[in-house]
Structures are given as C-alpha cells and as structure tokens.
Amino acid sequence: QTIPDEYFPPGSNWLMLGPSGPRRLRLAVEHLCQFRGGICFCIDLDPRWVIKLIKKGWMEHLEEYKAHCIQQALTILDSGHEIRCLFATPKLLEALALALEERGSSIADVGITGIFSGGTEFTPQWTRFATEELLGGPASEGGVYMTPTYGNTLMGLACSRPVVAEDGYKISYYAPQPRAVLEVIDPDNPDQLVDYGA
C-alpha cells in the first residue's frame, strides 16, 4: 500500500507545495485529499517562472522566490489547520525542512506524518538523504513516511512501493490501475502481445 492510513490518515488536511500548472498535479493531489476526506491548502510554485529565472542567471531572485513559497507554507502550518500530509517537490521539501530547522522545529514537529514527493531530482541518493537528514529516519523508527511519486497528464500519479534502506532506497513506480496499463507487443506483429517474462 503506497498511502498507508497510519501515515496518511483519512480525514487529514494536506499541504500542496509545488507547481499547480501547467500540469494536472495540483488537481490530482487536491482530489486525493478530498477523496480521503480532508482539505487541501495549496502553495503554487510556477515552474515556468523558475525556468526563466535560471535562464537569465538570476539565482538570487530564484532563491527569493523559493523563500517566498516556503514562508507561505510556514504560515499555513502555523495556522492550526492540523495538516498531516504534504506534497512537495524534493527541492521545496528540503527548503521547508531547513526553514523549520532554523526555527528549532522539524517536519515531524509540525505534525506531518506522510509525504508525497516527486520531481526530476528524485533518486535513491536523494531519498536516502531525505530519510536520514530531513525526515528523522525511517518511518518504522519514528521518522516521517515518504512516498516517491511520478506522474503525467495521460497516466496520472504513480506511487513507488515503500522505499527502504535494505533495497538501497530503490524507487519502483507502479502505474495506477486500471487507468494506466502497459503492454509489450511483438514489433514484428503489433497485434500480438509478448508473454510476461519472455
């Protein structure tokens, strides 16, 4: 189970900290939250603006924009909304954890128990760093649970099976069934499916 109730309690409120467009990510996270009975608070990061800042070499502006988004997230987390679940990109998750650390707090201290996170930076190395340095260790040892996610408009959100140190923090995404089904066909006979394991 990729969103265990223990860490993503039904009825919990969520914070969505990441891009709302041009993709459907915000809608997917918001729907998941509402389907599970909670309210989703959204902080939008515009990836198109981020790309423009990077292309212009305006790294100071980029850092200010990131700080602006993090400050909004902190305001929501401080407002008593009992947020237990979070979606954030890896860079924003790290920035949020560091901002909380500067205040003498942590992601767990503000009540977050489960995190969806996804983005191009998501690697086994980053997952290990996040687990050990940002989330207080593995969830089985009292840390915050994190589910790596990958998605696109056609498929939707695919979650990884639980990521653990024993597997080298390997990330294995599973497409949402039955919406996304993968089939391998014989290139010489496109009407013929290839048997599993062939």
Describe each PLM feature range:
Residues Q1-L27, H31:
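Conserved adenylate-forming
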Residues D5-P9, Q34-I39, E102:
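Alpha-helix capping at helix-to-loop junctions
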Residues M16-P19, F35-R36, K55:
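Intrinsically disordered, low-complexity segments enriched in small/polar residues
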Residues R26-C42:
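Conserved short alpha-helical elements in the N-terminal third of ANL/AMP-binding
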Residues I39-A198:
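Active-site glycine/GP-rich loop and adjacent strand/helix microenvironment
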